[in-house]
Amino acid sequence: MEESINPIISIGPVIFNLTMLAMTLLIVGVIFVFIYWASRNMTLKPKGKQNVLEYVYDFVIGFTEPNIGSRYMKDYSLFFLCLFLFMVIANNLGLMTKLQTIDGTNWWSSPTANLQYDLTLSFLVILLTHIESVRRRGFKKSIKSFMSPVFVIPMNILEEFTNFLSLALRIFGNIFAGEVMTSLLLLLSHQAIYWYPVAFGANLAWTAFSVFISCIQAYVFTLLTSVYLGNKINIEEE
């Protein structure tokens, strides 16, 4: 299987992956258009496109509210809705098509099939939980809950690191494996014409399975984000 490379651009010491940037902007655009389209001319009795939006919204609220609590849920409901939609689209983009030039430059893929991208997403989630902890409870109380008693500090640091790493590796492993398998099945169809029906059927079945797994991973990522955030902002006052 030929190795593909993503186009990059450097601005000083900073290197930007153009494929990842393009895919991210595309995802944000799709989410914006979907929410704008589905929320236009809303009525008290939902119908059609409004039903779709409300179903997705209720679904996301249903599995995140137990972790955040009703007290704070209204402040984070849109965040979790957008996060879930972002992860669903990001995980499935690479299954839709391939856009690669003759020299191996890749212009289309799931951004979550890139480990650096997933590590960045995971880091932002962990950073968000700490920022919200400080904003909700104050810097002093947040630090105290993290460092008291003193002997648990190493365990707290290890917990934060494992949360960060597991969140990234889980999504990367599943999405990357799905794209690799899809590429292998596509290559199989190029070996001989009699392999084409087999490769087509196998790829169709694998794509359906990958879409299911991708949606499950989006659910898990959003769920764990709500768990981590809830643990930071719902600590009982002493």
Curated annotation (Swiss-Prot):
One Gene Ontology term of the biological-process aspect is:
proton motive force-driven plasma membrane ATP synthesis
Q: Mind listing the UniProt keywords for this protein, alphabetically?
A: Antibiotic resistance, ATP synthesis, Cell membrane, CF(0), Hydrogen ion transport, Ion transport, Membrane, Transmembrane, Transmembrane helix, Transport
Residue ranges of the TM segments: 15-35, 76-96, 111-131, 167-187, 208-230
Q: What induces it?
A: Induced by a decrease in external pH from 7.5 to 5.7.
The answer to keyword Cell membrane applying to this record is yes
InterPro entries noted in UniProt: ATP_syn_F0_a_bact/chloroplast, ATP_synth_F0_asu, F0_ATP_A_sf
Q: Name one GO molecular function term.
A: proton-transporting ATP synthase activity, rotational mechanism
Where does it sit, as one GO cellular component term?
proton-transporting ATP synthase complex
Tell me the CDD domains matching this sequence. ATP-synt_Fo_a_6
Keyword match Transmembrane: yes
Where would you find this protein in the cell?
Cell membrane
Q: How does it sit in the membrane?
A: Multi-pass membrane protein
Family per similarity comment: Belongs to the ATPase A chain family.
Q: Main role?
A: Key component of the proton channel; it plays a direct role in the translocation of protons across the membrane.
Q: How does it assemble?
A: F-type ATPases have 2 components, CF(1) - the catalytic core - and CF(0) - the membrane proton channel. CF(1) has five subunits: alpha(3), beta(3), gamma(1), delta(1), epsilon(1). CF(0) has three main subunits: a(1), b(2) and c(9-12). The alpha and beta chains form an alternating ring which encloses part of the gamma chain. CF(1) is attached to CF(0) by a central stalk formed by the gamma and epsilon chains, while a peripheral stalk is formed by the delta and b chains.
What name appears for this protein in its UniProt entry? Answer: ATP synthase subunit a
Species per Swiss-Prot/TrEMBL record: Streptococcus pneumoniae (strain ATCC BAA-255 / R6)
Q: What gene does the UniProt entry assign to this protein?
A: atpB
